Amino acid sequence: MATDWLGSIVSINCGDSLGVYQGRVSAVDQVSQTISLTRPFHNGVKCLVPEVTFRAGDITELKILEIPGPGDNQHFGDLHQTELGPSGAGCQVGINQNGTGKLVKKPASSSSAPQNIPKRTDVKSQDVAVSPQQQQCSKSYVDRHMESLSQSKSFRRRHNSWSSSSRHPNQATPKKSGLKNGQMKNKDDECFGDDIEEIPDTDFDFEGNLALFDKAAVFEEIDTYERRSGTRSRGIPNERPTRYRHDENILESEPIVYRRITVPHNVSKEFCTDSGLVVPSISYELHKKLLSVAEKHGLTLERRLEMTGVCASQMALTLLGGPNRLNPKNVHQRPTVALLCGPHVKGAQGIRCGRHLANHDVQVILFLPNFVKMLESITNELSLFSKTQGQQVSSLKDLPTSPVDLVINCLDCPENVFLRDQPWYKAAVAWANQNRAPVLSIDPPVHEVEQGIDAKWSLALGLPLPLGEHAGRIYLCDIGIPQQVFQEVGINYHSPFGCKFVIPLHSA
């Protein structure tokens, strides 16, 4: 009774721990209650062992996928089995990729003489006319469907890339019919249905193989070859190449020195430029001495006022919008700037800045209180300013009530601190705070107490003072002091301006 099932293709489910096995029954032992399968597949993957034996207690479910016919179980273990039909034609039994038997039509011929290849029409007629003997050697649709279910996705048949992708553009896609498609599948299996080689269960050791590669020896061999061939060597001491590549530096670059300016006293605050150069602050006494020595060497007050006015006006034009705001298309909306100046040298700097702004088609309103006696620099600047289209007012009531585009503050001077107690000064501070316009301070002093007008930007001259948070963002202006003048007052100076006359400073 047990021998009747030899050669059958079965599927054995051993639960979640062992999985599902498929194969052909090779032995059934009723005494020990075991069953053996040859060419087994475990969960769709071909096993490395040729035979697997199961106990009855391990089997959860057993399904019979195929029962051999009469006389088929005599040679079930062979790889190829041949049966002769009534017409003398044979069919060959092979093992497909999932291990189950597959019947492939192959005419048996005792002669090795070449055969004539039939035409395409003859092949079609032969495919349609199937003899009863050939039907016995072909599998049913259910058997082919069961084989496709048990086949693993990772072991699918390799396809011919030329046949699938290199079809002639004018060639029509063949229609798929049931009978013809099945015969084409069998022909593909004859060509591409080889058994897949066994895959080793050990992973490739990348680290171990990399350790076997001696890079030092290879590099030494390359260097030796280059020296013998006369080519440019790599890393040989006291040897210069004859030619340089286009991306090689001929001159070695020196290390960058970021601290190029040193002062003779302790620095209370340091700044840095966009390129990283350190700019130290100096005290008001040292700054005053620097301007005095520069004036003695020819940098007069008139020249200093002109440089300050030009740089401050350029910065103000940039803050107003630059070419986007000041162009012929925006004549109807000219920017408005309010100048708040005091009766001192810093006020004269603001008046000269206002004159340059007025020359650039900016509407300037200058506030300067009336005094009986003015400085000569103030008088000269007012004389030039009166020749522009700018407006001068001495009363805060004449200042615009609507917000302006920019307020330039030149009210404060460290030598005239008493002006902060004057009514006009307090009124000007109140107007600037109520106007809510951004404020630019030109050469602001250092105050122990907070200023009345908080600036958004501040422009320092030569070297910055240790300004606080009330000064806003600090900018530095080059007023043309020579390097030897800095050295005369004890400052080791190297220009941080580069190609500009006004540069921004950042807190270090």
UniProtKB/Swiss-Prot annotation:
Provide the positions where the record notes the PTM Phosphoserine: 131, 138, 140, 161
Q: Tell where it localizes.
A: Cytoplasm, P-body
Which GO molecular function annotation, any one, does this entry have?
Answer: mRNA binding
Q: Which UniProt keywords apply?
A: Cytoplasm, Phosphoprotein, RNA-binding
Boundaries of every YjeF N-terminal domain copy: 283-487
Q: Which Pfam families match?
A: Edc3_linker, FDF, LSM14, YjeF_N
A GO cellular component annotation in the UniProt record: P-body
Can you cite a GO biological process for this protein?
A: deadenylation-independent decapping of nuclear-transcribed mRNA
- InterPro entries documented for this protein: DFDF (IPR025762), FDF_dom (IPR019050), Lsm14-like_N (IPR025609), Lsm16_N (IPR034107), Sm (IPR047575), YjeF_N_dom (IPR004443), YjeF_N_dom_sf (IPR036652)
Q: Where is the DFDF domain?
A: 192-228
Q: Where is the Sm domain?
A: 1-68
Per UniProt, subunit arrangement is: Homodimer (via YjeF N-terminal domain). Forms a complex with DCP1A, DCP2, DDX6 and EDC4/HEDLS, within this complex directly interacts with DCP1A and DDX6. Interacts with ZFP36.
Give the family from UniProt: Belongs to the EDC3 family.
UniProt domain comment: The DFDF domain is unstructured by itself. It assumes a helical fold upon interaction with DDX6.
Function, as annotated: Binds single-stranded RNA. Involved in the process of mRNA degradation and in the positive regulation of mRNA decapping.
Protein name listed in UniProt: Enhancer of mRNA-decapping protein 3
Q: Which organism is it from?
A: Pongo abelii (Sumatran orangutan)
Q: Which gene encodes it?
A: EDC3
